[in-house]
């Protein structure tokens, strides 16, 4: 059974003034949906706009154009009072577990603060009990509540950040590269923790990352971003088994394979040049300057994200005949 959309993004743009009449097009016309109860993975190289997109969804930025609707409500057209109420439903886990926690507050105070701001639960004692429950839920002993952030490892700090995000009983969480600053062994622990919490609490996640090998294990569907544009969206298993967009293929070919023989035999797709500047993106398809399959028409018109089969979207002139699902070459 196909789940209903919880959050819908339509033609979203987030441009920044760079001075001297220049504009940084961090997000440039992105459209997608996140279904209730799923984890939507968002991947791409550093600088592609994925973290900016996550911050727009959290209303940390006011979009230049487009809309973000949550259960049919436009998040960027809310009054101040309505925004305050919505803050309980939408929370964020930040990338840097070292910078996102106040060093002057104890762990208990960090987790307690959102509940006090929103006046949750009847008494201070009841809130303290919830703090202990949250610490246990993320794998930390309640006694750790009296300690300060500098006393913990990176993985433990990220667990504290997760507990803080859960303190308001949210429905939707933006996890902005929550494992990128952690050791590989700790990354797996945090991913497994998020999967367990999602199952127990019915959470919906936007999981932002640049490491496709880890995104595979947590995401139901994945969107691939490049230079502010969505290149491909499909089910996680389908993306890894049969990627369509040349950029997706290149990203997947960079994931190392543990078997040395298979690693030596497989074809690697090396992208030409550097990521273009979002101040001056290429005309037509923004990926054409690095694409191994670029055609003349790629510089003439920008391919639109189109559904070439149920639940599968790609923005590439190679698949312009959506009705027959045929590749041009």
Swiss-Prot record:
GO terms for biological process: peptide transport; transmembrane transport. Its EC number is 7.4.2.-. InterPro entries: AAA+_ATPase, ABC_transp_ATP-bind, ABC_transporter-like_ATP-bd, ABC_transporter-like_CS, Oligopep_ABC_C, P-loop_NTPase. The keyword tRNA processing does not apply. It comes from the Bacteria. CDD domains: ABC_NikE_OppD_transporters. ATP binds at residues 44-51. Belongs to the ABC transporter superfamily. This is Putative oligopeptide transport ATP-binding protein YkfD.
């Amino acid at each position: 059974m196909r789940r209903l959309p919880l959050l819908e993004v339509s033609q979203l743009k987030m441009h920044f003034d760079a001075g001297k009449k220049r504009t940084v097009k961090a997000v440039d016309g992105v459209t997608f949906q996140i279904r209730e109860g799923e984890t939507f993975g968002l991947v791409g190289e550093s600088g592609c706009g994925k973290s900016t997109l996550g911050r727009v969804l959290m209303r940390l930025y006011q979009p230049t154009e487009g809309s973000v609707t949550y259960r049919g409500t436009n998040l960027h057209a809310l009054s101040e009072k309505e925004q305050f109420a919505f803050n309980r439903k939408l929370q964020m886990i930040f990338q840097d577990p070292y910078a996102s926690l106040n060093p002057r507050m104890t762990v208990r105070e960090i987790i307690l603060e959102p509940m006090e701001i929103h006046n949750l639960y009847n008494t201070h004692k009841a809130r303290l009990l919830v703090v202990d429950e949250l610490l246990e839920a993320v794998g930390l002993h309640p006694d750790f509540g009296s300690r300060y952030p500098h006393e913990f490892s990176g993985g433990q700090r990220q667990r504290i950040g997760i507990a803080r995000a859960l303190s308001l009983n949210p429905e939707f969480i933006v996890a902005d590269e929550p494992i990128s600053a952690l050791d590989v062994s700790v990354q797996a622990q945090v991913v497994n923790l998020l999967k367990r919490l999602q199952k127990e609490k019915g959470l919906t996640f936007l999981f932002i990352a640049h490491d496709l090998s880890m995104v595979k294990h947590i995401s139901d569907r994945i969107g691939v971003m490049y230079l502010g544009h969505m290149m491909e969206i499909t089910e996680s298993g389908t993306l890894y088994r049969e990627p369509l967009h040349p950029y997706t293929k290149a990203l997947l070919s960079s994931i190392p394979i543990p078997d040395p023989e298979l690693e030596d035999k497989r074809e690697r797709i090396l992208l030409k040049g550097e990521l273009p500047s979002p101040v001056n993106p290429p005309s037509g398809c923004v990926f054409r300057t690095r694409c191994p399959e670029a055609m003349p028409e790629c510089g003439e018109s920008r391919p639109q994200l189109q559904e070439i089969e149920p639940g599968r979207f790609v923005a590439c002139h190679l698949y312009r005949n959506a009705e027959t699902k045929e590749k041009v070459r």
